[in-house]
């Protein structure tokens, strides 16, 4: 079984959902980034979704854009990110680790080269935010060659044709969007998406993880009650980093408390 399959099977037995935080690699510095990720994992994160800094992050809201800028200003490059990823894989051999990318960072070194490096670093999945399903063939093929799960976005207005395509191609998990737009939101209520999770499950799709706007334990619970296997929280995590840039010990303490509270909601 893959790491994702092992995780979802384990959580299902325990009647828990998955909590998957997102952070940008190297934010605010490479060394502190590793400490942040340690805090997330030690506090209950079931898997990680990690971003490689890119100068034009179209799908990201201002919070994650700022994180990207901080990492770039700290000199973080894709090369440095792969070094960090290799360190994380060695430290956490069973933890599912996914990348959330933009196509330029995959195309520039060569699609085949990029996925080969992912496999060498022990990456479980890659989601390319700006490549729609209908343009994904070369990326999907390379991912398959190197045993990396290609992750696809399921929008809240997906029709049945798209759901069938997602189910047929899905591996690892399906990223279920709470809403359209960019990451981060102050909306307290998530739209009901059980019709999507139910249909995807009936079609044999990989488990769904719901993201975009997941900032509170109640929203985690809402995602799980709607049939998602877990929740991805990014902007809320990155916002805590931004608020405590000058006081790293307090930052790490706040992150631990947040993850513990969010993870507790997966067990309710």
Swiss-Prot record:
Signal peptide: none annotated. The active site is at residues 49, 60. It is an enzyme of class 4 (lyase). Its EC number is 4.2.1.20. It catalyses: (1S,2R)-1-C-(indol-3-yl)glycerol 3-phosphate + L-serine = D-glyceraldehyde 3-phosphate + L-tryptophan + H2O. The keyword Manganese does not apply. GO terms for cellular component: cytosol. One of its GO terms (molecular function) is tryptophan synthase activity. Keywords: Amino-acid biosynthesis, Aromatic amino acid biosynthesis, Lyase, Tryptophan biosynthesis. Pfam families: Trp_syntA. Pathway: Amino-acid biosynthesis; L-tryptophan biosynthesis; L-tryptophan from chorismate: step 5/5. The keyword Amino-acid biosynthesis applies. Belongs to the TrpA family. The alpha subunit is responsible for the aldol cleavage of indoleglycerol phosphate to indole and glyceraldehyde 3-phosphate. PANTHER family: TRYPTOPHAN SYNTHASE ALPHA CHAIN, CHLOROPLASTIC (PTHR43406:SF1), TRYPTOPHAN SYNTHASE, ALPHA CHAIN (PTHR43406). Tetramer of two alpha and two beta chains. This is Tryptophan synthase alpha chain. It comes from Edwardsiella ictaluri (strain 93-146). The gene is trpA.
């Amino acid at each position: 079984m893959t790491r994702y399959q092992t995780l979802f099977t384990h959580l299902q037995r325990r009647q828990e959902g998955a909590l998957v935080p997102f952070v940008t690699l190297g934010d605010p510095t490479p060394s502190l980034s590793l400490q942040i990720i340690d805090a997330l994992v030690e506090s209950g994160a079931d898997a990680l979704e990690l971003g490689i800094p890119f100068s034009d992050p179209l799908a990201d809201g201002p919070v994650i854009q700022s994180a990207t800028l901080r990492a770039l200003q700290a000199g973080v490059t894709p090369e440095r990110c792969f070094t960090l990823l290799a360190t994380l894989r060695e430290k956490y051999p069973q933890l599912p680790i996914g990348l959330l990318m933009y196509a330029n960072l995959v195309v520039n070194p060569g699609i085949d080269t990029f996925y080969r490096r992912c496999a060498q670093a022990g990456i479980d999945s890659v989601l390319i935010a700006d490549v729609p399903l209908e343009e994904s063939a070369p990326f999907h093929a390379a991912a398959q060659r190197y045993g990396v799960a290609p992750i696809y976005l399921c929008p809240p207005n997906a029709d049945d044709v798209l759901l069938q395509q997602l189910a047929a191609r899905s591996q690892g998990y399906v990223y279920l969007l709470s809403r359209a737009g960019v990451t981060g939101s102050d909306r307290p209520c998530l739209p009901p998406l059980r019709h999507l999770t139910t249909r995807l499950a009936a079609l044999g799709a990989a488990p769904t993880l719901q993201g975009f706007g997941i900032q509170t334990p109640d929203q985690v619970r809402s995602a799980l009650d709607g049939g998602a296997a877990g929740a991805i929280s990014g902007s809320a995590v990155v916002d805590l980093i931004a608020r405590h840039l000058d006081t790293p010990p307090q930052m790490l303490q706040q992150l631990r408390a947040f993850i513990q509270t969010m993870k507790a909601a997966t067990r309710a």
